[in-house]
Amino acid sequence: MFTFFITTLIILASERTIQGEDLTNCEFTNTACAKLQQNFKGTYVQNLCTCDEGTTCSSSWSSDSDLQSITQGKDQYQFCYTIRTQKSKNCSSTEYAYKELTRTSIATNKKEISHNYYCYCPPESKYVYDKSEYSSTTHYEQNTRVFKCQTYPTCHEHEICQTAVERTDSYLVSKNCKCTGX
């Protein structure tokens, strides 16, 4: 018999959330402007960058027919533009699905983070870290983390299926493996 476990981690020190004027403009059409997550505490919205003229993208959960979002389980990524070509293409196990680019100004230490999607992970899959790439110029340091799709493994007996992180302003759940049975 398998048991369903959820571990909750409570973070007392709140991490600063980037909002409004601190957000950079979304650089590419495949850059996610927001990440939404549905869980039993509601829908959590993390704005990632702004669309044209500094407008934030949708903070509402979209239907599967929406061409400006990608749904991955209980997470949804919103985009400023139609992403039909990327959305309709499922990733193979060897393709890069997603890149997270962090560019840090050497002069000001200000970070710009962009989340770029290239294809869609199939249902019951997750984004898994594959590798990092680092480069620098006289003005910026740049770190790119690359992710691929991987099918969730089946949980073993007494293995933790999900991990929850609670902060003062958010509650996020990460699925670790596929639970079977009760």
From Swiss-Prot:
Signal sequence residues: 1-20
Entry comment on modification after translation: Contains 7 disulfide bonds.
Tissue spec. comment: Expressed by the venom gland.
GO cellular component terms, A-Z: extracellular region
Subcellular location: Secreted
Keywords of the record: Disulfide bond, Secreted, Signal, Toxin
UniProt GO MF annotations: toxin activity
Family under the similarity heading: Belongs to the scoloptoxin-11 family.
Protein name: U-scoloptoxin(11)-Sm2a
Organism, scientific name: Scolopendra morsitans
Classification lineage: Eukaryota, Metazoa, Ecdysozoa, Arthropoda, Myriapoda
